Amino acid sequence: MFEQNLTSEALTVTTVTSQDQITQKPLRDSVKASLKNYLAQLNGQEVTELYELVLAEVEQPLLDTIMQYTRGNQTRAATMMGINRGTLRKKLKKYGMN
């Protein structure tokens, strides 16, 4: 039986420095750095619905990529994501991807 051995450690961001050095770091580190940068730029301004903003920034490209990977097969995409097909359809509709 196949045992899935991938963890969040497998989700990495690859960058190339100005000295052409290639580095990889976990996606979560990039998200954290982006959030810190965003908050620093607020300059004391109030922000609301940050949770929804961050989810949308991650969820939409996730859905797009998974739908391309599965060639539009919603059942397979939902299974890969660990959600039911109805939830997937609702999310696709939310982002105008249906």
UniProtKB/Swiss-Prot annotation:
Domain of life of the source: Bacteria
SUPFAM superfamilies in UniProt: Homeodomain-like
Gene3D superfamilies the record matches: Homeodomain-like
Sorted UniProt keywords: Activator, DNA-binding, Transcription, Transcription regulation
Entry keyword annotation includes Cell inner membrane: no
Pfam families assigned: HTH_8
Function summary: Activates ribosomal RNA transcription. Plays a direct role in upstream activation of rRNA promoters.
Keyword DNA damage: no
GO molecular function, one term: DNA-binding transcription factor activity
DNA-binding region: 74-93
InterPro entries: Fis_DNA-bd, Homeodomain-like_sf, HTH_Fis, Trans_regulatory_Fis
Entry similarity comment: Belongs to the transcriptional regulatory Fis family.
Protein name: DNA-binding protein Fis
Gene (UniProt): fis
Subunit field text: Homodimer.
